[in-house]
Amino acid sequence: MNIVITGGTGLIGRHLIPRLLELGHQITVVTRNPQKASSVLGPRVTLWQGLADQSNLNGVDAVINLAGEPIADKRWTHEQKERLCQSRWNITQKLVDLINASDTPPSVLISGSATGYYGDLGEVVVTEEEPPHNEFTHKLCARWEEIACRAQSDKTRVCLLRTGVVLAPDGGILGKMLPPFRLGLGGPIGSGRQYLAWIHIDDMVNGILWLLDNELRGPFNMVSPYPVRNEQFAHALGHALHRPAILRVPATAIRLLMGESSVLVLGGQRALPKRLEEAGFAFRWYDLEEALADVVR
């Protein structure tokens, strides 16, 4: 397959692209910084500096859209919220326009989203049919998905990746949590009762490959079948590192530090991968402690 990818130097892209190359696919990465992308991804990947030079995507078999400003790196000022939205919406709209301008469009657009689509639903078991709670993360993801779905046609199916917390050794949530936990300074956040829907990076990559190869469309919760509470996650991470994890971080401190974006760690979703499992996808990593032991070793 000839596959175009945005966000290729991000956490998921860095793990996905080597697998796609192993499988014999031809990969083109859309990037703002070709020099950086080349150093990260190597010489086997073709690079496009943006999409301005493209008038259509004829000859492209699939598009995987992973681009977007990291959501938890900065406080959510008005300006930062705008960056979070536009970094996702604009590139997605450009891809949709190119797909719709193609005589032979890609057969699939796999486009990013997040379990934040649902907002903070507390104890509710969240499948893809669950009505969302209307807050910023929902508004961001709902518009992102709505734009992507404009590419849907008889020739092009659209799959939406409602991604949970990705566990990987080289970034994501563990990139922030590992330093204090390695020092024995980790612990639950707030009450610790909030749910965390996690997925091992291997299952994330394999899930995308599954959607690439199977005639599926619509939203998919990209999460393990077994979400855990924050306090369970903290205990499991401490256990994987052979360190205590008992220093609870008060919710008040998190709110002072993060502002509105504190909802990302003080709230959560008890999300389940209902549609992936119904379609026959087999997860490799069910047990959180085993998954964490694998990524921190």
From Swiss-Prot:
InterPro entries: DUF1731 (IPR013549), Epimerase_deHydtase (IPR001509), NAD(P)-bd_dom_sf (IPR036291), SDR39U1 (IPR010099)
CDD domains hit by this protein: SDR_a8 (cd05242)
Highest rank taxon of the organism: Bacteria
Pfam families xrefs: DUF1731, Epimerase
PANTHER family, sorted: EPIMERASE FAMILY PROTEIN SDR39U1, SUGAR NUCLEOTIDE EPIMERASE RELATED
Family per similarity comment: Belongs to the NAD(P)-dependent epimerase/dehydratase family. SDR39U1 subfamily.
Protein name: Epimerase family protein YfcH
Lineage: Bacteria, Pseudomonadati, Pseudomonadota, Gammaproteobacteria, Enterobacterales
Gene that encodes it: yfcH
